[in-house]
Each structure stands twice: as C-alpha cells, then as structure tokens.
Amino acid sequence: MDDDVAALVVDNGSGMCKAGFAGDDAPRAVFPSIVGRPRHQGVMVGMGQKDSYVGDEAQSKRGILTLKYPVEHGIVTNWDDMEKIWHHTFYNELRIAPEENPLLLTEAPLNPKANREKMTQIMFETFNSPAMYVAIQAVLSLYASGRTTGIVLDSGDGVSHTVPIYEGYALPHAILRLDLAGRDQTDYLMKILTERGYSFTTTAEREIVRDIKEKLCYVALDFEQEMSTAASSSSLEKSYELPDGQVITIGNERFRCPESLFQPSFLGMESTGVHETTYNSIMKCDIDIRKDLYANTVLSGGTTMFPGIADRMQKEITALAPSTMKIKIIAPPERKYSVWIGGSILASLSTFQQMWISKQEYDESGPSIVHRKCF
C-alpha cells in the first residue's frame, strides 16, 4: 500500500455509523444507521424528491418516510440499504473516492461467515476498494485501551457482547451475546415515563426520550437503597425541558432505566444481567487466563456511558468472583467511540500494512479470502 494514502475506518453500529481516517483520534462522521424511503410518491412538492435518504437527513424528514435499520443486533440484515449507508459514508460524509483508499470495516463478534464474505464482495466489486480488512469490534476496543488481553463488555444500541480476548485473539467459544442494549433502555424509559403521566409514543418522541436517557440517567450502586432515597426526598429529582417548552420532572426513573442492564427482568426478559454475563464469559475460558480477564475488564460502547456503571460492575463481579481475585473495571472516557479509535490505531500501524486483503488477492481467491486473512 502507498504510505501517503490515508486508510478509511468505518464502524457500522446498529444505531450509529462512525467513519473517518486512520491516524485521527476521533471519527469525522457520526450519523444514524438508517435509510428512509418516502411513504407516498410525490408528497413533497418542489423538493426534488429522492427515492431514499440516509442518516441525519432521513432522521430530520422521518415524518414522511418509512425508516429502516439495516444493522439489527449488530449484524447486517439488509444489504441493499447497507450499500446505501456505505455510499453515503464515502461520497457525502467523508467525500473521498473508495477506489483510492484502503478500508477497515468492523464486524460484530460471531458475525456469520456468509456476512463477512458479502461485506468483502461489496467493497471489492461495488466500490472497487484497493484493499480492505474486517476486524472484530470488541478487539478494537481492547486495542484502544492499550491492551491485547482482557474481556470487553461492548454494549451499543442494538446488542451487547462479552468478548474474552487473549493476546489479540477473541475466544469464540466464550463470547456471549445479550440482546439487551440502548434501544431497549430507551423503550423502557418511554414506558416508565408514561406511568408518571408523560406520553411519549412516536419515533420523534423516542428521540427526546433517548436524549433524556443520555443526559439524566445513571446506574445506582445499591438499587434498593437508591429507591428508598428517591421515595423519601426530592434530592434525586431533575427537570428536563421538552422542545415545546414544557418542563418535566424525573426522579427514580433516572436509575430505574439503566438498572435493566443488571436486572433484565425489568424489561420482561429472562436473560442474565451484564455483570453475570461477563462472569459467565470468563468462566468459559481456560482457568489459567481468568485472572488476566478479571483484572482487565474493559467497558465499550454508548450504553456503557451511564455514570456509576463501572463502580456497579466492580461491586457485582467482586460478589461473583473468587474472594481473593483482583478485579479491575476499565471505563475509558472515550468508550463511546473506542471501537472506531481502535480501528484507527490498527490501520495506521506499520506492522498492519501486510495484513490488508488486496484487490489482487480478492480477484485470485474470491470472497472466502476474508476468513484466511482476517481472524
């Protein structure tokens, strides 16, 4: 690869797409992973109507569009719409020619083989990529924290995973997936705010609730104690101004919402909480490496951004683990983007330059090359 051409790094999440250039310390473009199509033809007079909208534009015109999320639970399920998102990323957001820049894409842990091949095929055949690579999201987050061994709890908008990693390689037999993430938290907050007498139902109002969640929610260290504090005083109450000027007050909802990460039964789910899932993941690993995993538990993704989450994880995992075990939860301040940052670091390493799948290798071997070169 030419050294003077910047590699592109694109992290496709269920909720947001993060894109930018290797070597940068943050993504240049962050936009919702949505594609919208007009519900009725010819509604918008004189708008020069397009047949589809992507990202922020789809979000702002959502009143007249049908919105689709091509990435569900971290996995691409709709390739036509995914192609639109990639096209938008290259041409509208980054404004580069994809045929000139090597590209690092990210994938969910346990991404099906056929999916990795399809991604590879689209990049080489539709976008004429000169070189590309597919990396596992959680592994990149671990790199971003300066480690090669540890366990990552990666929780985004659509899915959470616990991924044990040893010497840079994810251990597939011990990866656990939890379909409990940011979107569920937002829905749950909508539900409990409705119980307080505030009605939030439309997709537009859901965005408001997401904002309330991001600004005001936190994880309680001791849920029962926090509930009694909230019942006996108004010290935990905060107010929030809605776009129409109405002010609402929110109290115990602030910590009841993210509590569902630790008690999924709140959402009517039977799964284990994030703390227990992390512990179960560690227990599926070889006994000799567990110590390293307990001492290097890294939080990653937007849903781990709640204040108080690291202390609570520390408390819960300490209760589950052997009593002499040293437990350390690492919560980097930039963890919302740590997958992307890890990709930026990886793609700019000199030692990584021989790892790219080149167009020539793809032409010789076909899409299955991805399993041999990206692992």
Curated annotation (Swiss-Prot):
Keyword presence, Nucleotide-binding: yes
Record-listed N-acetylaspartate modification sites: 2
Gene3D superfamilies: 3.30.420.40, Actin, Chain A, domain 4
Listed SMART domains: ACTIN
Sites bearing N-acetylmethionine, chain numbering: 1
Reactions that this protein is recorded to catalyse: ATP + H2O = ADP + phosphate + H(+)
Compartments (UniProt record): Cytoplasm, Cytoskeleton
EC number: 3.6.4.-
Record keywords, A-Z: Acetylation, ATP-binding, Cytoplasm, Cytoskeleton, Hydrolase, Nucleotide-binding
GO molecular function, one term: hydrolase activity
Main enzyme class: hydrolase
UniProt cross-references to InterPro entries, sorted A to Z: Actin, Actin/actin-like_CS, Actin_CS, ATPase_NBD
SUPFAM superfamilies: Actin-like ATPase domain (SSF53067)
CC per GO annotation: cytoplasm; cytoskeleton
Domain of life: Eukaryota
Nucleus among keywords: no
Role of this protein: Actins are highly conserved proteins that are involved in various types of cell motility and are ubiquitously expressed in all eukaryotic cells.
Similarity comment text for this entry: Belongs to the actin family.
Name assigned to this protein: Actin, cytoplasmic
